[in-house]
Amino acid sequence: MEEQTFASRLNDILGEISSVVWGPYLLIPLLFGTGLILTIRLRGVQFRKLGTALRHGLLDRDDEGGKGDISQYEALTTALAATVGVGNIVGVATAISIGGPGALFWMWGTGLVGMASKYGEAFLGVRFRTTDAKGGISGGPQRYLAAGIQNGFGKFLAWFFAIAAVIAAFGIGNLTQANAVSAGLEDTFGVDPRLTAVILFIGIGAVLVGGIKSIGKVTAAFVPMMIVIYLVGGIIVLITHAGDIPAAFGMIFRDAFSGTAATGGFLGAAFIIALQMGFARGIFSNESGMGSAAVAASAAKTSHPVRQGLVSMTQTFIDTIVVVTMTGLVIVTTDVWKLGPDQAGVMTARAFSAGLGSDWGGMIVSVSVVFFAFSTILGWSYYGERNAERIFGTWATTPYRMAFTCVVVVGATTELDLAWTFADLANGLMALPNLVGLIILSGLIARETKAYLDFDPKLKASPDQIDQFLIDSNNPWRTAPNKMEAYLTPKTKTTNSEAKN
């Protein structure tokens, strides 16, 4: 009983801290402001170049002449594996059950401006990446904050991020996800949580032994499949409730600014609650501004930071504008959002059951949760590993992988009432230093992005042309990635017009 009381008190304390971090005076304006600043300085690159980015990332897949540990497509699927997780199913339901349908609008908002933030952090991840003692590529906020902001403040931000990322990896990327897998298999198929723990331990451990190359191959194989299965199920539900779709959109846009009145088990929500829940669950879902995806992006085989930045920003589009929208519309059109916050965990399953039948609907959601959560564990294991290396050195790789794999067992076999509150707080602590860094380095991002896109607007330049461009612009990025700290103010000269053809 004392343990339950202590857990309840701890949850309340963490909840209070999280409400301040995610409140209207700190992360919400900082998230939106950073995305807006980058959107303006990059001249809406997420809208102008979305088609080009989708083609380059999903169709071209490989960047000829690029150096890195994994292909740019594998980097994208690794980042998608980490983001398309429980937040897309349970997180969306939680946001709507507390903030009302209007929360979905603000989740879209985090996605649209967040695409610019995602572009910026992926650009910087590649721009300032280094080669570690074992010959692997290492990058992310823990690197570019220190290298790009060349003073004590930059180092402070980098270390703050690294510590928060290691902690968050065990929360958002492990405990909550393993618990979701265990609960899903037990509820749908009656699998004993202890058996799930053993399966996860073996499966995760087998993949992590191979490092990022193994993670990239696994995620590239099953991430597209799991997303397609979920979307097809959602489309069928929407077809069966097609007449309710216009009213659902009207409710989403209206309630985003006016709040939602109490109805059924829903307690009602003011505008600020819809805004707060939309932003908090939005970043939990797409991780834009958190800096996590920059770690995966930095490992990609790419011939220029701009090219990988564009590919990486499609991750937020797929996650929020596609998958989150599907979940939200299914929940709103079937009216299950009125059940109330205490039913958030089963809302999506009930919504799918309303259109597909109880057996098929519940099975698709449960299987999706299992796959989404498993993939999230893989992606976040790499994020945490790279930040652990930043703190302790490359010797920490093996102990970290062992610890991360063991914690999966804890998550699968233990009730985790604190998990979501802890995950929200950890996400916020990661985002704070990264967002500050993105604002400070926004000039560098905008300057080099403009220079490259003026030279190669359709991303069709050959490796030789890009090499010449780097020489002409006095940019040693590809030939001397470990010396980027000394290069912050490039003088762009005449570009190679052949790339435009």
Per-region residue spans from a language model:
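Transmembrane helix-loop junctions in multi-pass membrane proteins
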Residues: 42-46, 88-92, 101, 170-181, ...
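Flexible loop linkers connecting adjacent transmembrane helices
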Residues: 44-72, 94-96, 100-104, 108, ...
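Extracellular/periplasmic helix-exit of transmembrane alpha-helices
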Residues: 121-129, 133, 235-251, 259, ...
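Helix-loop-helix module between adjacent transmembrane segments
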Residues: 34-39, 110-135, 142, 146-179, ...
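Alpha-helical membrane segments and immediately flanking helix-loop junctions
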Residues: 64-98, 124-127, 133-142, 146-148, ...
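Membrane-interface loop-to-helix entry segments
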Residues: 30-34, 38-54, 161, 178-185, ...
